Amino acid sequence: MQSAVNEFLTPRHIDVTELGPTRAKVVLEPLERGFGHTLGNALRRILLSSMPGCAVTEVEIDGVQHEYSAIEGVQEDVIEILLNLKNVAVVMHGKDQAVLSLSKQGPGAVTAGDIQVDHDIEIKNPELVIANITSDTSLSMRLTVSRGRGYQPVDARATDEDETRAIGRLQLDASFSPVRRLAYSVESARVEQRTDLDKLVLDLETNGTIDPEEAIRRAATILQQQLAVFVDLEGEKEAEPEQKEDQIDPVLLRPVDDLELTVRSANCLKAENIYYIGDLIQRTEVELLKTPNLGKKSLTEIKDILASRGLSLGMRLENWPPASLKNND
């Protein structure tokens, strides 16, 4: 009787309904009374304010010295162009900053698809209109794309370089979060005779750089990592200056075979020199889908198994691989 009273219900049913290519509805039930709002509000705040992503942070437009200029032969003024550039959905693989170029001869629309990118950079909304050229003229610009988290105004990125920055390098407030809209609601749920339970409904829309399901997984992982410190309260830990190498989660040092993947998925990973779980979580979905013979079904299997262990694809690890693995090799 005592154990039944102290035991908390955990969600048994997780239903994901795709409402579009970048929108999904996720339903979790049952939850103990009150836990719907507790978890829903925590996930909502993380998804809207703390998710990592990429955004345009600086622009140089040929012939433009400040944002209050007008460009001859271009319908939009510079401020409108900058606002449109904020909506470019870009993904960078393996780098934190890149400079891209855009050059278009008019007349006609200038879209995000006209941006020239490297092989490790993707534009997810190439149809986005940046400007409209109304005459036989050209529009050229250079875009600095950076990786960050949440929302970052220009003032928060202030550095010593600002005083010597050349005229014409226009700074943008950046919204790095890939989540465009999120709403959650809590409905009633029932398990046998209990009718006082919660059902959490998340309606999430992204900018296309990440799947809605993956966004929720990453937000849950962030929340889990932040709460983990409360599990073992030992007070303030003393610094260990003699320890040169950061501690690595032992789970990441285990071979991918421990994930008990299907033979097909395991062989595909090994063919790409992915031997440890730490190697795997640093790969992105796009990178894995480029692996020969590894399809979306195998990718879904990998993501689900990682999520069950509180992990996800696209994570970044410092000092990987650790010295212990290098020595073994």
UniProtKB/Swiss-Prot annotation:
Region of interest (Alpha N-terminal domain (alpha-NTD)), residue spans: 1-234
Signal sequence annotation: none
A GO term for molecular function: protein dimerization activity
SUPFAM superfamilies linked: C-terminal domain of RNA polymerase alpha subunit, Insert subdomain of RNA polymerase alpha subunit, RBP11-like subunits of RNA polymerase
Pfam families from the UniProt entry: RNA_pol_A_bac, RNA_pol_A_CTD, RNA_pol_L
Protein keywords: DNA-directed RNA polymerase, Nucleotidyltransferase, Transcription, Transferase
A single BP term in Gene Ontology: DNA-templated transcription
Region span, Alpha C-terminal domain (alpha-CTD): 248-329
EC numbers: 2.7.7.6
Xref: InterPro entries: DNA-dir_RNA_pol_insert, DNA-dir_RNA_pol_RpoA/D/Rpb3, DNA-dir_RpoA, RBP11-like, RNAP_asu_C, RNApol_insert_sf
Any one GO CC term of the record: DNA-directed RNA polymerase complex
Reactions performed catalytically: RNA(n) + a ribonucleoside 5'-triphosphate = RNA(n+1) + diphosphate
Similarity annotation: Belongs to the RNA polymerase alpha chain family.
Job description of the protein: DNA-dependent RNA polymerase catalyzes the transcription of DNA into RNA using the four ribonucleoside triphosphates as substrates.
Subunit field text: Homodimer. The RNAP catalytic core consists of 2 alpha, 1 beta, 1 beta' and 1 omega subunit. When a sigma factor is associated with the core the holoenzyme is formed, which can initiate transcription.
Domain notes: The N-terminal domain is essential for RNAP assembly and basal transcription, whereas the C-terminal domain is involved in interaction with transcriptional regulators and with upstream promoter elements.
Protein name per the record: DNA-directed RNA polymerase subunit alpha
Organism: Saccharophagus degradans (strain 2-40 / ATCC 43961 / DSM 17024)
Gene this chain is encoded by: rpoA
